[in-house]
């Protein structure tokens, strides 16, 4: 009890101690270069704009000391975003301070364990802080129904989407909240400008992305990598006869080249089944080998004979995008089965999928009762968790690198529910005294 009272009175001091501990652990670890890091440092064509610009700005200012500067700046961005996120939640959701201290520690875990995002030159280093800020402002708009908070959310979301496009699901979720707020407060006309901005945001992001590549790489096009990731799961479940769905000789030749290599290396679903392996584990283990190690190099080799390196990458992206949709349609049941398994893998198992769906429906069912911020928060954070994994599962393997952004959500919901039970129990005891 004394500890809880101390935390309650000295919350800022306790958070400061957590921040100092995390900072020490980050500073004593060197910054690491991952296989993807060079693409951001050298501003590769297949990288979205924000993080390469961030890295190269730091490189231009700090020169040989850029790694240390990156580590410090990435840590500071993280600490600032966590602090803002926690302080805003404390203002609008009444929980015991102890729960918020625990939540702060959980939000800081990606900086000291497993991902160590401040110590890596990867998009996660700034995507995570941007994600927390975007989430916080959407929650504030949901709580307070002030369009100022929505404006801030859209600004951070714009930057976030130019860092990692997997967060596009915030747009439909934002539209639903905006319609709900407008209906509830009868402010449809007043909210039309924000509605227009939300609808146009994906197009503005696409235009900005293309403009960036025109300025930096000389090509007015979106970051060319989408088609490769869309085609990879479709190729995993394909069979040799699927070449017949294509009418273009170019697409037929590309399909045959990809399929032959995948089959020879046992990267496809048929190999997993014949070897008695778990399909989703086999897919997760081989996704990068299919996408980055097979589809891309085969296309690169084919098209670089006649095109420049950048033009060849654009051609690969266009061709793989065109090939993906017909192949998915032709094998839709198998593709859908793989998608569902990949989606469930992102939650670790299907029971957690069911749990998150139940929690989401619970939150939605309670948003019209008194003290709704708790239930709005439950509905929103479970919805973004489900949406994130749902969109990642379409064209990626659902590794923690792409799903860790919401690892805190289940803890947060449990803290809300435990606090509610505790508060109800204490109130009930007082009435019997």
Question: What residues fall within each predicted segment?
Answer:
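Membrane-interface alpha helices of multi-pass inner-membrane proteins
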Residues: 150-164, 201-204, 209
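Specific aromatic-rich, kink-prone transmembrane helix
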Residues: 126-143, 152-157, 175, 409-413
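Extracytoplasmic catalytic/substrate-binding loops of multi-pass membrane glycan-assembly enzymes
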Residues: 26-68, 222, 316, 332
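Transmembrane-helix motifs of polytopic, lipid-linked glycan transferases
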Residues: 72-94, 129-137
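Multi-pass, polyprenyl lipid-linked donor-dependent membrane glycosyltransferases
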Residues: 73, 113-138, 160-170, 402-407
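Transmembrane-helix signature of polytopic, membrane-embedded enzymes
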Residues: 85-110, 128-129, 148-152, 379
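Membrane-interface anchor segments at the N-terminal boundary of transmembrane helices
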Residues: 68-77, 306-386
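Membrane-proximal stem/loop segments at transmembrane-domain junctions that anchor or position
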Residues: 222-330
